[in-house]
Amino acid sequence: MGDNRNLPVTQPNSINFNVVILSIFFSGSFIGAWAFFNRFLKQYTKATEIPQNVFRKRWLFGKVTAVGDGDNFHFFHAPGGLIAGWGWLRPLPELNKSDPPISSSKVGSSVPIHRRIFDSIFGRNKTRTAYSNYFLGLPVPYKNKRNLPTISIRICGVDAPERAHFGNPAQPFSEEALIWLRHTLIGKCVWIKPLAVDQYNRCVAKVEYWTWTGWKNVSLEMVKQGLAVVYESKTSAEFDGEEDKYRFHEMAAKARRRGIWSQKQFETPGEYKRRI
């Protein structure tokens, strides 16, 4: 009996069990935090980085840093927005102010100058001229900022008039559409819903921006203003299930002869591209 007192005392197995539990807890916490980061806080800098499970299901928040055409722009992804520190802990890109603001006095209309003088003297195409002057007079507060880690966005469901490219002339209202989009989006934070990646590796997306009357769909607003047509392709068009709404507002704009529909002879962007 006396010899038993000299034997080493063994610790209960509960210590090893606690170590296992703590290891599982910390491993699970790390994996959960990593999954949360990848799902909600990871920044995407190009369309091909966006995971497939995001398309058609989730919205991404960010800032418009450049508008280069009437139906596309550059988007700086700011995942998590203000809650994730963007704008106060993590810097958002600062854009340089336009000085002076872009207006009809600085940016010429897509209508040739001799045609505009003729129209003003003889009173031809007054409706078209009025719409053109309105859009060309919209102020654009910021300049484009390039060379940033941004996603190139193609606005879904619509086609804006073609600007001058490779020596080809611009379509009427192409400059007006560009200025309206710059006036509406540049320097602002928007939500995008990725729908697809096109042949140019741009993210085709539904885009919404905030106004005093609520959130607006950029594509629908362009159609309502007569600055874009419903996208004509039957195979690659993306409407996020709202094609009927796009068609309705296009017919309404056409009936009111708004923007592009104020022309007597109108060639759609699709027809223009096929012709040239």
From Swiss-Prot:
Cellular compartments per GO CC:
membrane; mitochondrion
InterPro entries linked to this entry: SNase_OB-fold_sf (IPR035437), Staphylococal_nuclease_OB-fold (IPR016071)
Report the active site residues: 154, 162, 202
The regions listed as transmembrane in this protein's record are 17-37
PROSITE patterns tied to this protein = TNASE_3
Q: Where does this polypeptide localize?
A: Mitochondrion; Membrane
Sites binding Ca(2+) sit at 159
Q: Topologically, how does it sit relative to the membrane?
A: Single-pass membrane protein
* Keyword terms, alphabetized: Calcium, Endonuclease, Hydrolase, Membrane, Metal-binding, Mitochondrion, Nuclease, Transmembrane, Transmembrane helix
A GO molecular-function annotation: endonuclease activity
For this protein, the Enzyme Commission number is 3.1.-.-
Principal subcellular localisation of the protein: mitochondrion
Q: Which family does it belong to?
A: Belongs to the LCL3 family.
List the protein's name.
Probable endonuclease LCL3
Q: Which organism is it from?
A: Zygosaccharomyces rouxii (strain ATCC 2623 / CBS 732 / NBRC 1130 / NCYC 568 / NRRL Y-229)
